[in-house]
Amino acid sequence: MPMLLQADALDLSELIRPGDTVLWGQANAEPLPLTQALMEQRARIGRFRVMLGIANSRTCRPEHADVVDFLAYCGAGANRELANAGALDILPSHYSQLPGLIASGALRIDVLMLQLAPADSHGRYSLGIAHEYLLPALDHARVVIAEVNRQAPRTFGERTLGDADLDAILHTDRPPLENPPARIRDADARIAAHIAGLIDDGATLQMGIGAIPDAVLGALRGHRDLGVHSGSLGDGVAQLMQAGVITNARKNRDRGVSVGGVLLGSRVIHDFAHDNPAIQLRSTTYTHDPDVLASLDRFVAINSAVEVDLTGQVNSEIAAGSYVGAVGGALDFLRGAQRSRGGLPIIALPSTAGANSRIVARLNGPATIPRSDAGLIVTEFGVADLRGKTLRQRVECMLRIAHPQHQATLETQLQANATPL
């Protein structure tokens, strides 16, 4: 039987050792009472390491680096504060690689912290808000500590847990964290309209996170029998399922089911997913599997970027010298869409950020996605289909979707650069 922990007498130093690496569910799956206690007790434990995903709380702050070494696969959310303070190291991994890194021990996870939904009548716990890379960590961690949260949604997935899987349990009753709604600007809405015009009825969608994916979902209300296979599921998915737009009726696998790895939204998606067999959470080994993605007909992958150069190279990691994004799952999904029958690999972004063009002659950060994987690039000014295009043809296409105020400057910069395309 697992040890029963008490919130007012919680001593994690009995379970966590100096030198350990600790992992927990990202975003709204964070077991907040456990992670907060971990940071408060860090000096008592001794130096250890934390592997972060998207951070929707400020549980981990730069001052905690006095004892804690932070690493993450992304700079999203509150991770940006750690990165800007020089307190965060980045794991530049494709999302599909994370389970293998954990299982092989290349990314050793000693302690796993989970937020679970209460046990059912059979004594089985749902993983609640996230599956993702938590399953391989569950199989390899020395210690598994669970917050069993009375308000966590009970979701369907590939695995449930019993007491034998857990070393310690803390019972709580609190609202899970939520994602605030993204602010959709005019440029986002125009981009969404372009993308919606590319999507056929019966297509299966993968969406990244942020204003553009939310705007795209809002622009699809006139479509029929859409499906979803994505890394994350948000409020827009719940709303389109309730409206009968997303039915998953034409998917050639997981028919009738929206598949994702994590719920990334507000109480809207949490409540909708609760005890709902039409939503299933799966491990990253399934959601990002290249063969699974390729097998989905009309698979449309829609992801964002910091900037794209005139030949189709994509920087999804660094903006203005700060690590704000990730290698993440974009390339996994884009390659899946390229292999899918009737698939569409889409990168979408506004043409500008303030006074600066996001269509650039040369990237100001790494080439997260190489130009050999370029598909369709969409801004508010149109669609550049780079598939099968030569470098010169790509430049022409990309200039047409750049902001008109920057087109002449981009041409001048390209001509001034002595290196070939």
Question: Which residues are covered by each model-predicted region?
Answer:
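Conserved alpha/beta enzyme-core scaffold
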Residues: 1-421
